[in-house]
Amino acid sequence: MSRPLTFLGIESSCDDTAAAVVRAEGTRAEILSSVVDGQTALHAAFGGVVPEIAARAHAERLDLCVERALEEAGLGLRDLDGIAVTAGPGLIGGVLSGVMLAKGLAAGTGLPLVGVNHLAGHALTPRLTDGLAFPYLMLLVSGGHCQFLIARGAEEFSRLGGSIDDAPGEAFDKTAKLLGLPQPGGPSVEAEAAAGDPRRFAFPRPMLDRPGCDMSFSGLKTALLRARDGLVAEKGGLTRADRADLCAGFQAAVVEVLAEKTRRALAVYAAEGAAEPALAVAGGVAANGPIRAALTRVAEAAGVRFLAPPLRLCTDNAAMIAWAGIERFRAGGRDGMELSARPRWPLDRSAPALIGSGRKGAKA
C-alpha cells in the first residue's frame, strides 16, 4: 500500500474560489476541509460570469480560502506532502491567480507542485468518493463542458463524444436568463420545471438522428427563445405556468438527449471488458435530479453500477483538485516553476477538437 499523502488543493478556474485539504491512504481518502467562496452575487446582474470580475475576486480571496482550509483541517503547510492546483482549462485570469499562489507556496515550503487538469478533477471524483476502479465510463456535464470519457488511469482518458457547441449547463443558464429566473440557471430551471408540463412544447432532441455520442444544445436554446417570443407576442407576457412548462419541456429534452447518448457510450465502453463496469457522472449539471434519475435507469438497464458524487462535489471544488493531484503525484507527475496556466487543455489529446465554444472558451 502506498504511504499516506496529504495535499492542499487550489481551484479558481471559473467563478468559485476554493481550497481544500485531502488525505489519502491507498484507495481510501478523507476530505479534511473544503472551502468554497462562490461569486454568484458578483455576477448576478450580468446574467453570466464576467471574466474580469471573476479574476479580480480570485486574486482577493484565494489566500484567505487557503488559510481557512488549513485552519479547518487543523494543519499547517509543514504537515502537507504536496500542493495541487488547477492549471486549466478555464478562464485564464482566474487560473493564473491560482497557479501563481500555488507556485509561491511551493517555492516557500519546498513542497512538490502538481498542476491538475480541471476536467480530470471532475472525472476522478468517483475515485475520491467511492474508490471506483479503472476503467469506468464518465459523463462530465457542466457549465462549460459535456463529454463522454473512458477513464483508464489518472492521466489516461479516451473521449467518445461531446457537445459540438454549447454545454448543457450553459444552456440551462441561458434558459434561466431568457425566462427572467435567477442565476445559476440549473437549480432555477429545475425548480420551475417541477411544476410544469413537459409535453406542452415540442422542443427538438438535437442529434438523436445521427450516430455516435456527440451532442448539440444550441438549437434547443433557439427553440425555447422562439417559443417564449411566441407566447409574449400572443399574450403580452409569460404566466407562471408558461415559465414552468417552458422549463419542463427544455429539461425533458436535455434529459432525453443525455440518456440516449449515454446508452450509446455504454455500448462502446462494454468493449473494455471491465471487471466491475460502472457509469459515473460529474460536473455541476450532475446535481440535476431528473438527469440523475434518467442516468440511473440507463445504467440499471445496461447492468452497470451508477455513481454520482454528493451534490457538494458536483460543482467546482478544491477537494477534487487535491485528490487528482494525489493521483497524478502517485503516478510520478509533478511540475516545476515553469507550470503555466492554460485556457484550453483537452483530457484526450489524441481526439479531434470539438467544434464550437462554450462559456469557458474553446472546448477542451
UniProtKB/Swiss-Prot annotation:
<dbReference type="GO" id="GO:0061711">
    <property type="term" value="F:N(6)-L-threonylcarbamoyladenine synthase activity"/>
</dbReference>
<keyword id="KW-0963">Cytoplasm</keyword>
<feature type="binding site">
    <location>
        <position position="122"/>
    </location>
    <ligand>
        <name>Fe cation</name>
    </ligand>
</feature>
<comment type="similarity">
    <text>Belongs to the KAE1 / TsaD family.</text>
</comment>
<feature type="binding site">
    <location>
        <position position="173"/>
    </location>
    <ligand>
        <name>substrate</name>
    </ligand>
</feature>
<feature type="binding site">
    <location>
        <position position="288"/>
    </location>
    <ligand>
        <name>substrate</name>
    </ligand>
</feature>
<dbReference type="InterPro" id="IPR017861">
    <property type="entry name" value="KAE1/TsaD"/>
</dbReference>
<feature type="binding site">
    <location>
        <position position="118"/>
    </location>
    <ligand>
        <name>Fe cation</name>
    </ligand>
</feature>
<comment type="function">
    <text>Required for the formation of a threonylcarbamoyl group on adenosine at position 37 (t(6)A37) in tRNAs that read codons beginning with adenine. Is involved in the transfer of the threonylcarbamoyl moiety of threonylcarbamoyl-AMP (TC-AMP) to the N6 group of A37, together with TsaE and TsaB. TsaD likely plays a direct catalytic role in this reaction.</text>
</comment>
<dbReference type="GO" id="GO:0005506">
    <property type="term" value="F:iron ion binding"/>
</dbReference>
<dbReference type="GO" id="GO:0005737">
    <property type="term" value="C:cytoplasm"/>
</dbReference>
<dbReference type="InterPro" id="IPR000905">
    <property type="entry name" value="Gcp-like_dom"/>
</dbReference>
<feature type="binding site">
    <location>
        <begin position="140"/>
        <end position="144"/>
    </location>
    <ligand>
        <name>substrate</name>
    </ligand>
</feature>
<dbReference type="InterPro" id="IPR043129">
    <property type="entry name" value="ATPase_NBD"/>
</dbReference>
<dbReference type="InterPro" id="IPR022450">
    <property type="entry name" value="TsaD"/>
</dbReference>
<keyword id="KW-0819">tRNA processing</keyword>
<keyword id="KW-0012">Acyltransferase</keyword>
<keyword id="KW-0408">Iron</keyword>
<feature type="binding site">
    <location>
        <position position="316"/>
    </location>
    <ligand>
        <name>Fe cation</name>
    </ligand>
</feature>
<keyword id="KW-0479">Metal-binding</keyword>
<protein>
    <recommendedName>
        <fullName>tRNA N6-adenosine threonylcarbamoyltransferase</fullName>
        <ecNumber>2.3.1.234</ecNumber>
    </recommendedName>
</protein>
<dbReference type="GO" id="GO:0002949">
    <property type="term" value="P:tRNA threonylcarbamoyladenosine modification"/>
</dbReference>
<feature type="binding site">
    <location>
        <position position="186"/>
    </location>
    <ligand>
        <name>substrate</name>
    </ligand>
</feature>
<dbReference type="Pfam" id="PF00814">
    <property type="entry name" value="TsaD"/>
</dbReference>
<keyword id="KW-0808">Transferase</keyword>
